[in-house]
Amino acid sequence: MVSGTVDHIGLAVKDIEKSISFFKEVFGAELLRKNVVEEQNLISGVISLGSINVELMQSTKDNSVIDKFIKKKGEGVHHISIQVGDLDRFLGELDSKNIKILNKLENSDYKIAFIHPESAFGVLIEVIERLT
């Protein structure tokens, strides 16, 4: 078993600027970074709320994952992200337990994979290994 810690909570939003302003004004959140994630067709804004980070995600393209999510379920919690030390090893353990993985992505900063909600009590879980 690989132990993990909560990395962040992901929220799907229609307007990232409005949502960043809300968390800053209401909760005193600090914007850590904001960037376009082209391979996922979204704008990501990560804010700090004390000991937890929240990723705000706005779609940049019709029919992207976030666009479809919002059309189907509305704005709200999209995923919980759990950080592990070795994603490939962890995925091997999941495979041996017949836990369904949706997809895996990698860039210079991190490797991520998503555990299908069917395998995780209706929750989309992002598993992340930070490389930097």
Label each region the model flagged.
Residues M1-V2, G45-S48, I82, L91-T132:
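Vicinal oxygen chelate
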Residues E25-L31, N98-K100:
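Conserved acetyl-CoA-binding loop of GNAT-fold acetyltransferases
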Residues S19-K24, L94:
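Conserved active-site tyrosine of GNAT-family acetyltransferases
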Residues K18, N35-Q40:
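Short glycine/proline-centered loop/turn elements that form peptide/ligand docking sites
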Residues I70-S96:
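Short, solvent-exposed interaction modules
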Residues K14, S48-G50:
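Short strand-coil-strand connectors
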Residues M1-K18, E75-V84:
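N-terminal beta-strand motif that seeds the catalytic metal site of vicinal oxygen chelate
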Residues E30-V37, K104:
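Conserved catalytic-core motifs of GNAT/GCN5-like acyltransferases
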